[in-house]
Amino acid sequence: MPILEVNNLRKIYTTRLGANRVEALKNVSFSVEEGEYVAVMGESGSGKTTLLNILAALDKPTSGEVKLGARNIAEVKEADITRFRRENLGFVFQDFNLLDTFNIRDNIFLPLVLSGKGFAEMQRRLVPIAKKLNITDILNKYPYEVSGGQMQRAAVARAVITNPQLILADEPTGALDSKAADNLLELFSALNNEGQTILMVTHSVKAASHAKRVLFIKDGAVFHQIYRANMSGEQLYQKISDTLTLLIAGGEENA
């Protein structure tokens, strides 16, 4: 059953005086099944960021619809959208988005605090997550006292502690060194193997090769997609690289 459905999504940006129109997304349609791990790739300016912002309910499409768990996001009232986002989506960003004035524990607790959860409930959820992510000994430290890899694991903990239907990750390995990036990608795979649905936007072929499906966006439209099926990580890496070469060279859409 699809946990996310994107139907004929269009986004047009118009300049202030209406002289120029830029179509950032052109009738984009796809779905993400519960438990899938999907990577979205494309060149800068292809529409990936616009798509992610709409999926995150941070922007609205010009036309088309996005359904999360069968609910049309556009029908969520403006007053309820923040709560809807907090209860259904988990976010992992390139720059971590941790608050320097909060220790790691309080950063992770933040979405639960905003949802009105009590300390006992928050602690009950945190203990197994912190153990799994290997961050138990840094919970009392502040973001500026830990490494980039530790900050990103804390951000992942914050994303999963609400039990979201879907994790949206935006270039999650972009600010990490190769070892920390590898650790994060292994963590994402482990979370996915436990049933967590993940959609990740990335420029990294290595990151995308950990996913079970890769969507390619070009000029605001879905250009191609690859399913991992029985491919090894190395085989998927090569197929992604070949597709990106075709995309950059201007190959046929849906080739």
Which stretches of residues belong to each language-model region?
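A short, proline-enriched helix->beta-strand linker immediately N-terminal to the Walker B motif
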Residues: 161-165
